[in-house]
Amino acid sequence: MKTTDSRDPMLHWELFIRQRGSATQGVPPGKEALTWVANTVTLIWGERDALLVDTFLGDAQTTELADWIEAKGRTLRTIYLTHGHPDHFFGLTLLLQRFPQARAVARPNVVRRCERRRPRTWSRIIGPVAGWDRFQNV
């Protein structure tokens, strides 16, 4: 699902929404289809450049997101992380590889939270978490 608002002809935004499985437990038998959550990112763009708000959790959805961004024909300059939950920043590595001109930014408390959320356990499950050498505080 995508939602667009283009009231300002110089600045545009669009939501990119995808469902993913969740860690919901204790669902009654036969109701397993209810164990999902929605992830949403926002792309804001002008004439040439774009800013992305948050990322996705997994590689498949992040690849789909990167394809969607490329289709806009703008240069992704910034990825802003709103908070340190894995489903908002685990796609950062793939996006920074795909868009080498982009920089990741977040408030210092968000960076600290992200750092705490990337223990060895997560790395074993999903691989490298983020391009921390390119992460900048705002």
Where are these regions (language model features)?
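Active-site HxH/HxHxD metal-binding segment of metal-dependent hydrolases
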Residues: 67, 71-138
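Zn-dependent metallo-beta-lactamase
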Residues: 1-48
